[in-house]
């Protein structure tokens, strides 16, 4: 069963933890790709200098951040990569969760072809470990791009999160990645991951 709007309508920090162990589903050419969410980061616009919406900043690019909980915010970085976020809390609050890493579960050959243009069996150990172990890596592997920006995960048939109950794990809380510019916010312990999971991007 997919997650509902009520599930997403909470503080980004709480949602980031509760998404761990849930399963992201992405349909590509009629085939459902599935991956367990193993690493997330929370962003809270009002108080977070790492957020694209810090201090109420509102632009065409960041407008999805102000949308309903459960909306996808997909943004472009470094001129070639995408990052996928899910909006939380309430409309207008500019809170969201970055999905940082997935553990591939179903249709791994297609995931591998999208990521490396190779069958999974052809990948070396480094490639297998890095197939979805980072926000842009998982976007490539699950074909998530600007077309998914604003997509409603509560209604979409091609991008949503399943309420699968994987809960036999310990959650590590630590600093976020790549936000040294964010002054005191760089020290917020708002990154969460499943302890000892091989697909976590940074431990």
Swiss-Prot record:
The keyword Transport does not apply. InterPro entries: Formyl_transferase-like_C_sf, MPG, MPG_sf. Its EC number is 3.2.2.-. It comes from the Bacteria. Gene3D superfamilies: Methylpurine-DNA glycosylase (MPG) (3.10.300.10). Pfam families: Pur_DNA_glyco. One of its GO terms (molecular function) is alkylbase DNA N-glycosylase activity. It comes from Clostridium botulinum (strain Langeland / NCTC 10281 / Type F). PANTHER family: DNA-3-METHYLADENINE GLYCOSYLASE. Belongs to the DNA glycosylase MPG family. GO terms for biological process: base-excision repair. Keywords: DNA damage, DNA repair, Hydrolase. This is Putative 3-methyladenine DNA glycosylase. Signal peptide: none annotated. HAMAP family: 3MGH.
